[in-house]
């Protein structure tokens, strides 16, 4: 496994179980703020920074030049944040199938782990703390070889909060961890934006996982280097790459 130095994982739907809860949080916020949002549109934007989703939906509904556009976006986003944070503070939360076993295996192979997300920092911190994944991370959310993960990056730490599909979260993780060759990085996530960000960052592989927001058939429509039903299957692929 000498060629792979870092695996970049998405969070909700990839390493953290998501039974469409995030999608439902969007719908509740939309309903409360008079925003029309179809399931197809919302699911298609999973993985993007959450404010961007509301910007897109309000643009579709009234146009970005409407005098109420900015205030409507902010109103919907604030309501969504309250709903989302309450959900992650109060509802059961657990890793996806094979996640912790894969983390242990990567550690045994001296491969670093970074978590990226479409969530903003506050809700990401709630998730990390509840799962105990924040142990060993410093104030910049960078860990050591002994911590469970070595980096946590959100759009909140990126200029203008530009998350996926831009490559910046992956590139920031690489920089913080002292990894300078993108071809030593593998990316995996459960949305089209995860796949796209892996390619935009010029990763060695950009893989998809189908136990999150998108089915295999849905992800297969987008460029990818392989799709897996679980992180356990993904681990088998990584093992085979080392042969």
Which residues fall in each region the model found?
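Glycine-rich phosphate-binding loop signature in dinucleotide/nucleotide-binding domains
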Residues: 2, 109-111, 177-182, 241-242
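N-terminal helical cap/lid subdomain that shapes the substrate entry/recognition surface
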Residues: 2-100, 108-109
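Short, acidic loop-to-helix structural element flanking the phosphoryl-transfer center
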Residues: 85-115, 119-132, 167
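Acidic di-acidic motifs
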Residues: 17, 189-190
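Substrate-recognition "cap/lid" segment bordering the active-site pocket of phosphatases
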Residues: 121-186, 192-200, 216-218
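Short, glycine/polar-rich helix-capping loops at beta-to-alpha or helix-loop-helix junctions
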Residues: 211-222
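Short acidic-hydrophobic, aromatic-tinged amphipathic segments that line or gate anion-handling sites
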Residues: 226-233
